[in-house]
């Protein structure tokens, strides 16, 4: 297999593992709570450190990716994530669990500002490449639901962390052995890419940050809450945790393919024309889901997750289209630090909010957040001014 394909395979696997690790806890939390004599809602705040560092850790990770090298950072990502997973599996007290999850979040923060710029840096179809990479990440979410449910039921919650941890270590070893060293760090390469007016760039980054924050909150609310939400709304119809995990995995798998379609559209049309209807469609679906039960609710979960996952490629597409490769990891790191740092609040509030007000209120809140995202995206310029003549040839390799 050519080295470029091996690199792509390992980077896409890394994205899957990144999301898988962050969501094992959301599926296993009921089993952990039962073992420790607690309720799952009271355990959810213990994972907030993981999501805070998942965001804040993006700043140093992005800086090191540009200035030191992306290959070395990806090796650290795989090996560190695996070690952290084994640490979670060995936790004996809630505080130990919180510390181990926080360490896991720190290593997980490396992937997005480093792995995604690495996989698109030589791509002639960045939208499709981002869509395929996003599909891999969301399949990791699907696998988290079904694999965790299976392992929890058969072998206990600790193995649900240990098995993916060993896979991550294996990927790290393969990455170190197979992927060649970079000739120079990205920050030292010659400049290539579009040059846009400062006012346009400020507007794009303003919208990108706001949309990233609200979109990340929706992503965290859904992916961390869907497992318990499905258990509540399908009670009496499906009560087996493994079957619930399978249903959730099916929904995530189907929804994940939306990113391939969206990626192809991004390569052909202005970002705003594709992004706006996708976020707008989330609003009525969350409103309908708030009062639905049974299989109707499951159909709505499938529908709204198509649009939640379909919205994921846009922020990365903005960075690829408008930011030179020399500083993409740093820009991505800054964006991720803000959006994931703020959206970590969603994880912290999930348990207490559901305990106090129920899932109906949560779904209504998500509808309001999606409406805000729609407003933010509407502020994007319809068409971006053409790049300067000097930048155009180089830009064709990175912009659709």
Positions of the model-derived regions?
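Cytoplasmic helix-loop-helix junction between adjacent transmembrane helices
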Residues: 100-137
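A late C-terminal transmembrane helix in Major Facilitator Superfamily
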Residues: 322, 326-357
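Residue-level signature of mid-helix packing/kink "hotspots" within the transmembrane helices
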Residues: 23, 50-59, 141-142, 252-260, ...
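Extracytoplasmic gate region of multi-pass secondary transporters
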Residues: 25-26, 203-257
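Interfacial helix-cap and linker-helix signal at transmembrane-aqueous boundaries
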Residues: 32-33, 64-65, 147-155, 230-231, ...
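Helix-loop-helix hairpin linking two adjacent transmembrane segments in secondary transporters
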Residues: 133-180
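C-terminal transmembrane helical hairpin of 12-TM major facilitator-type secondary transporters
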Residues: 268-315
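Conserved MFS/SLC helix-loop-helix module at the cytosolic interface between two early adjacent transmembrane helices
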Residues: 56-92, 266
């Amino acid at each position: 297999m050519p080295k470029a394909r091996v690199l792509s395979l390992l980077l896409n696997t890394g994205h899957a593992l990144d999301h898988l690790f962050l969501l094992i806890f959301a599926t296993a939390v009921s089993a952990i709570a039962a073992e420790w004599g607690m309720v799952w809602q009271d355990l959810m705040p213990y994972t907030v450190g993981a999501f805070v560092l998942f965001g804040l850790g993006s700043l140093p990770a992005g800086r090191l990716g540009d200035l030191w090298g992306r290959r070395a950072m990806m090796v650290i990502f795989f090996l560190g994530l695996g070690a952290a997973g084994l640490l979670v599996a060995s936790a004996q007290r809630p505080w130990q669990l919180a510390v181990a999850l926080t360490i896991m979040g720190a290593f997980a923060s490396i992937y997005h500002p480093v792995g995604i710029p690495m996989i698109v840096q030589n791509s002639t179809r960045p939208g499709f490449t981002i869509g395929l990479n996003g599909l891999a990440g969301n399949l990791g979410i699907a696998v988290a639901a079904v694999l965790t449910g299976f392992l929890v039921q058969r072998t206990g919650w600790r193995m649900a962390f240990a098995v993916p941890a060993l896979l991550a270590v294996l990927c790290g070893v393969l990455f170190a052995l197979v992927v060649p060293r970079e000739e120079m760090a990205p920050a030292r390469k010659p400049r290539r890419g579009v040059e846009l007016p400062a006012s346009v760039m400020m507007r794009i980054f303003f919208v990108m940050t706001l949309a990233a924050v609200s979109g990340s909150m929706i992503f965290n609310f859904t992916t961390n809450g869907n497992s318990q939400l499905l258990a509540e709304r399908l009670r009496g119809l499906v009560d087996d945790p493994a079957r619930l995990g399978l249903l959730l995995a099916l929904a995530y798998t189907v929804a994940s393919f939306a990113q391939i379609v969206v990626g192809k559209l991004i390569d052909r049309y202005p970002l705003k024309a594709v992004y706006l209807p996708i976020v707008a469609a989330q609003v009525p679906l969350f409103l309908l889901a708030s009062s639905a039960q049974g299989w109707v609710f499951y159909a709505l979960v499938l529908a709204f997750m198509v649009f939640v996952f379909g919205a994921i490629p846009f922020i990365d597409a903005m960075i690829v289209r408008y930011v030179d490769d020399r500083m993409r990891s740093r820009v991505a790191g800054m964006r991720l630090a803000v959006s994931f740092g703020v959206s970590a609040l969603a994880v912290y509030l999930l348990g207490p909010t559901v305990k106090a007000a129920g899932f109906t209120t949560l779904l209504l809140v998500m509808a309001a957040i999606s409406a805000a995202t729609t407003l933010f995206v509407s502020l994007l310029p319809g068409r971006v001014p053409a790049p300067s003549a000097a930048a155009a040839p180089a830009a064709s390799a990175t912009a659709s």
